[in-house]
UniProtKB/Swiss-Prot annotation:
Assigned keywords, A-Z: Copper, Disulfide bond, Glycoprotein, LTQ, Metal-binding, Oxidoreductase, Repeat, Secreted, Signal, TPQ
Gene name as annotated: Loxl4
Every SRCR domain range: 33-134, 160-288, 312-412, 422-530
Amino-acid positions noted as binding Cu cation in the UniProt annotation, renumbered to this chain: 612, 614, 616
The family this protein is said to belong to: Belongs to the lysyl oxidase family.
Name the UniProt record assigns to this protein: Lysyl oxidase homolog 4
2',4',5'-topaquinone PTM sites in chain numbering: 675
Organism encoding this protein: Mus musculus
Cofactor comment: Contains 1 lysine tyrosylquinone.
Region of interest called Lysyl-oxidase like, as start-end residue ranges on this chain: 534-737
Keyword match Ribosomal protein: no
Enzyme Commission code(s) on record: 1.4.3.13
């Protein structure tokens, strides 16, 4: 509800005139629906429809399950469970748009059903209908976005920022303290502090990418306000006279992901007798930045132990603060089902990780499918929980969730100004070109190029992330065919080495004085970015189940020897007499990403191998290694990508890649490539290895030649016991699937890495 206002005063809202786009394709005549009610469940509530820019209700006359089914499907749910009459979810306001709705049950939208017509009704709001939908989302219903959070009259609040007041706050990024301003009609407007609460500050800070808020010195800011108001030439005095206090009052619960969800009272228009902010001043907010965005690292303190705290991480996101949600339970990482997944629960995840509130809650494995167990389903948060583990939830195995239903988030992050310090020039489109960066040279900002020495896919990934362009497709060292910016011809950065977790190239290691062996020009670094990427994952269980030993005669290993699939000691044997002891196994490599996995080299450069009569499209596709418990290699092998193809695909997905007849090579999204145990080079040569306990390791795409959304799951490891005659593999797992101490006990070393993505 809005606060009551005198009818003689005209009000105007700081709201966008355009409606937020729907998350599903709809025709221009399709009406938006929403569910409103006292519960925090997104799948149930009072049914409301948007018509002529105003939300209204639906009467329960003639309403039944088939009408509820049409409404639920339009809202993105699979079906309807039931419906409720007599305003069970509370009485609505405004018009009753529809009455005597009659559907066959096959309509795609509610406005395709029969009714009395728009606004033709003899009902009262005590007859408002409600629906309860099945919590499972339809395939293809992608996300709940902040832009879909409509305010009054179907409109939404615009952008928010903090205008720094203190001189010290103006010199640093991100800005964490200042006056709240909102953007309308191309101008920034102020917000009155009357009735301003910490709940309001929490919502504003969340929108700006900060997990929490803190109190401000209101007495100091009031003193500054009074001094500036006495100065007739001050900007503040001028703005006040122009009645720039657009929002007069805000009332938030603190759990809202956006100000559009708060109650807003809007200031009177210009020329009205009532002042916009009588006796008040602009609202001032102070936010607390997450650990990734603080200007100075906090001093080490004794942290309170939370033994039961549920650990959360994000995977496969293109940007900082986005990814598939994974939680650590029973010492193993697993995913979260998207049933009942919404912005409030997603915001708890974001804040737990040090980001702001969620700007998007994604459904249907939109950021790729995870591995292992599905730990949680039907997560229901109220918004103030410290961790996701404090929310109500079911076990993921209880309601038939699959990894196709993995939930993901996109969080609000602070504006660090990084995106303005890199650009691409000369490319065919905005997603490719020569990399130009801005650095300080003798205290003066200067644009220039990056030396391509040591330039690789990791550095390109950081660049694309900094630009907000997703993943890197190619890292280019030779860019003579792209014309850069004339004023940025000089090399200003060289020796760049990134770990992959940086938010900007400027955070990577690099030379002090620039040293580039090639000089500027054609050897400047370049990138080509893409919105989505593949994600290769090996079936660890199949490796464990199919491992065995074979003593293979040298007479049958000529081709394998030619392709370097045997240990070095094989070079000194008396061919064709003797044998090699081989640890053989089968492997399945799945593409769980959002784009096809294709060889980096074009087919014109594939190499023909006469012995096996096949083409190599990637020099090394996998590494097979046997390690001691301290990580030293005792045996190794490699497998060239002689045949990348879709061996099998899920039902309904067509195979796209096949090696026969010099066909295209690759692995399509959702498909997998199988290498049977009985083909050449599908082994590790352990002839020279003595009995003992070892670690068996397989790494896919080991040199990161082809871009992926997540490289951390490219490795599997198994415990291996070899007694000289037999071999046992057990505890096979993806490299990042267990928590650190479980890995330590298994391998005596910590291999887990969890970056910002």
């Amino acid at each position: 509800m809005m606060w009551p206002q005198p009818p003689t005063f005209s009000l105007f809202l700081l709201l966008l005139l355009s409606q937020a786009p729907s998350s599903r394709p709809q025709s221009s005549g399709t009406k938006k629906l929403r569910l409103v009610g006292p519960t925090d469940r997104p799948e149930e509530g009072r049914l409301e429809v948007l018509h002529q820019g105003q939300w209204g209700t639906v009467c329960d006359d003639d309403f039944a399950l088939q009408e509820a089914t049409v409404a639920c499907r339009q809202l993105g749910f699979e079906s309807a469970l039931t419906w409720a009459h007599s305003a069970k979810y509370g009485q609505g306001e405004g018009p009753i748009w529809l009455d005597n709705v009659r559907c066959l049950g096959t309509e795609k939208t509610l406005d395709q059903c029969g009714s009395n017509g728009w606004g033709v009704s003899d009902c009262r709001h005590s007859e408002d209908v409600g629906v309860v939908c099945h919590p499972r989302r339809q395939h293809g219903y992608h996300s709940e976005k902040v832009s879909n959070a409509l305010g009054p009259q179907g409109r939404r609040l615009e952008e928010v920022r903090l205008k720094p007041i203190l001189a010290s706050a103006k010199r640093h990024s991100p800005v964490t303290e200042g006056a709240v301003e909102v953007r309308y009609d191309g101008h920034w407007r102020q917000v009155c502090d009357q009735g301003w609460t910490m709940n309001n500050s929490r919502v504003v800070c969340g929108m700006l990418g900060f997990p929490s808020q803190t109190s401000v010195n209101s007495h100091y800011y009031r003193k500054v306000w009074n001094l500036k108001m006495k100065d007739p030439k001050s900007r503040l005095n001028s703005l006040t006279k122009k009645n720039s206090f657009w929002i007069h009052r805000v009332d938030c619960l603190g759990t809202e992901p956006h100000l559009a969800k708060c109650q807003v009272q809007v200031a009177p228009g210009r020329g009205k007798l009532r002042p916009a902010c009588p006796g008040g001043m602009h609202a001032v907010v102070s936010c607390v930045a997450g650990p990734h965005f603080r200007r100075q690292k906090p001093k080490p303190t004794r942290k309170e132990s939370h033994a039961e705290e549920l650990k959360v991480r994000l995977r496969s996101g293109a940007q900082v603060g986005e990814g598939r949600v994974e939680v650590l339970m029973n010492r193993q990482w697993g995913t979260v089902c998207d049933h009942r997944w919404n912005l409030i629960s997603a915001s708890v995840v974001c804040r737990q990780l040090g980001f702001g509130s969620a700007r998007e809650a994604l459904f249907g494995a939109q950021l790729g499918q995870g591995l292992g167990p599905i730990h949680l389903s039907e997560v229901r948060c109220r918004g103030y929980e410290r961790t996701l583990g404090d929310c109500l939830a079911l076990e993921g195995s209880q309601n038939g969730c699959q990894h196709a239903n993995d939930a993901a988030v996109r969080c609000n992050i602070p504006d660090m100004g990084f995106q303005n310090k890199v650009r691409l020039a000369g490319g065919r489109n905005s997603e490719e070109g020569v990399v130009e960066v801005q650095v300080e040279v003798n205290g003066v900002p200067r644009w220039g190029t990056v030396c391509s020495d040591h330039w690789g896919l990791t550095e390109a990934m950081v660049t694309c992330r900094q630009l907000g362009l997703g993943f890197a497709n190619f890292a280019l060292k030779d860019t003579w065919y792209w014309q850069g910016t004339p004023e940025a011809k000089e090399v200003v950065m060289s020796g760049v080495r990134c770990s992959g977790t940086e938010m900007a190239l400027q955070q990577c290691q690099r030379h002090g004085p620039v040293h580039c062996s090639h000089g500027p020009g054609r050897f400047s670094a370049g990138v080509a970015c893409m919105n989505s990427a593949p994600d290769l994952v090996m079936n660890a269980q199949l490796v464990q189940e199919t491992a065995y030993l074979e003593d293979r005669p040298l007479s049958m290993l000529y081709c394998a020897h030619e392709e370097n699939c045997l240990s070095k000691s094989a070079d000194h044997m008396d061919w064709p007499y003797g044998y090699r002891r081989l640890l053989r196994f089968s492997s399945q490599i799945y593409n769980l990403g959002r784009a096809d996995f294709r060889p980096k080299a074009g087919r014109h450069s594939w190499i023909w191998h006469q012995c096996h009569r096949h083409y190599h499209s990637i020099e090394v596709f996998t590494h097979y290694d046997l390690l001691t418990l301290n990580g030293s290699k005792v045996a190794e092998g490699h497998k060239a990508s002689f045949c990348l193809e879709d061996t099998n695909c899920p039902s309904g997905v067509q195979r796209r890649y096949a090696c026969a007849n010099f066909g295209e090579q690759g692995v399509a999204v959702g498909c997998w490539d199988t290498y049977r145990h009985d083909i050449d080079c599908q082994w590790v040569d352990i002839t020279d290895v003595g009995p003992g306990d070892y670690i068996f390791q397989v790494v896919v795409n080991p040199t990161n030649d082809v871009a992926e959304s997540d490289f951390s799951n490219n490795m599997i490891r198994c415990r291996c016991k070899y007694d000289g005659q037999r071999v046992w593999l057990h505890n096979c797992h993806t490299g990042d699937s267990y928590r650190a101490n479980a890995e330590l006990s298994l391998e005596q070393e910590q291999r887990l890495r969890n970056n910002l993505i």
